[in-house]
From Swiss-Prot:
Pathway: One-carbon metabolism; tetrahydrofolate interconversion
Species this protein is from: Ligilactobacillus salivarius (strain UCC118) (Lactobacillus salivarius)
Keywords of the record: ATP-binding, Ligase, Nucleotide-binding, One-carbon metabolism
Family: Belongs to the formate--tetrahydrofolate ligase family.
Name of the featured protein: Formate--tetrahydrofolate ligase
Amino acid sequence: MKDIEIAQKSEMLPITEVAQKVGLTADEIEQYGKYKAKISLPLSAREQTKRKLVLVTAINPTPAGEGKSTVTVGLGDAFSLLNKKVMIALREPSLGPVMGMKGGATGGGYSQVVPMEDINLHFTGDMHALTTANNTLAALIDNHIYQGNKLNIDQRRVIWKRVLDINDRALRHVVIGLGGATQGIPREDGFDITVASELMAILCLSKDISDLKKRIGQIVIGYNFDKEPVTVDQLGVTGAITLLLKDACKPNLVQTLAHTPAIVHGGPFANIAHGCNSVLATQTALNLADYTITEAGFGADLGAEKFLDIKTPVLGKTPDTIVIVATARALKMNGGVAKDNLDEENVAAVEQGFANLKKHIQSMKRYNVPVVVAINKFTQDTDAELAKIVELCEQDDTKAIVADVWAKGGEGATELAKAVIESCDNDQEFTRLYNSDDSVEEKINKIVTEIYGGDGVEFSAKAKRQLRQFEKLGWNHLPVCMAKTQYSLSDNAKVLGAPKGFKIHVREFVPKLGAQFLVALTGNILTMPGLPKVPAADGMDVDENGKISGLY
């Protein structure tokens, strides 16, 4: 059966019963129908949990993804089978990849969060609220310029873009304000995808609504004619933008097919944003369950690095164990096998591609966090390929366990769960990659050399000018969010495996003072993706009874 068919045949518990599993009362949730709810914050004081945190990441993926969410869900269900008090914390899917390349993003097979159709489509409206808030701010900026421009905003240097929660390459570069004197001030503009919006990052890094409001006020929307930054606070609309997000900042509660409680909240991409679910979601799970299993987008070079260097300082908690998801097909691709031949057995290519997994293991251990490798089993994998991965990991002094979570759900990950539980009891002191007082160049160089395995960084003339400006403005202390291809450790998507001797090319920076990081745009990475030649939307339908098919 397809994933959507499995989900549609499942019997969900009322969300009130799911909430009770982690001690949430009816007064502490706001129901969105029978099977979804928002968690009301702040929660009342309760007994201290073990507060163990497991971060699930992956190797550099194939275009279809390696099942990181599927493993996260299956692992959570396995913890439940072992009678552990557990919660899963995932990101919300964006309609971009749902309609584009990957289809849905709620796990797969018998390791899914449900109701999957709702979560993948409009869910509780968080994405729409973010899109509206972002575009309201854009409209207020252009209105301010049109109505006299008291702040002397240079319309050539407005950096706040409009957003849309779908891949649409035609909107990357637009000209607005055309049509005459009453239609606004003409200027160049563009659209990003909603999940790349600074408001998404702010939502995911805020500790409470007061912090959300403070961060929104700090957003730099552009520069005046004296080249000084202009903020939302100066524009005077901080309260208006915050109130549009007052419900979106509350974590969403759902369940897995096996009824394990799951929080699905916030959805920044890891290649063009920081790739982690909200601090509020993770903190809520830590307060309610002994074990919180969360994930960070794409490979360990992107989502995990940003989780460790950007999210954990705000969260105030570092992972007790990192699980790296690997697949035979991704190793074969990193070993040089063409995409059309990945289903064929090729143990030699698995061994060749292991260099990619080995680099990610090394990078995560650099933070002094225990690492367990989860080999996500696909139906076409052979015993020889899976055995080779286990063997190579053991030679690298890393525990690796095959997880069959797509076919078996939590039962396919009980051995993995036992290994992770044991690993969580190791009390190791976390080691940070860089310090806040390192220069921006030093921070990026450490990411490139220690996490990517590169030789260094090259900055464009524009990036160098921006670095000088950031130093004058006192922004050097901020962490760096690298915007880079997910398919390679380098900034060239075609260079697979574990390349050496390369440099990362930073073409420009985007300061995100509300999110409190600087985005470094590398290579040809885009903040508004395009749809593929045959988008996933082509196979989707809904019948006369409202039953959805083809979602994935």
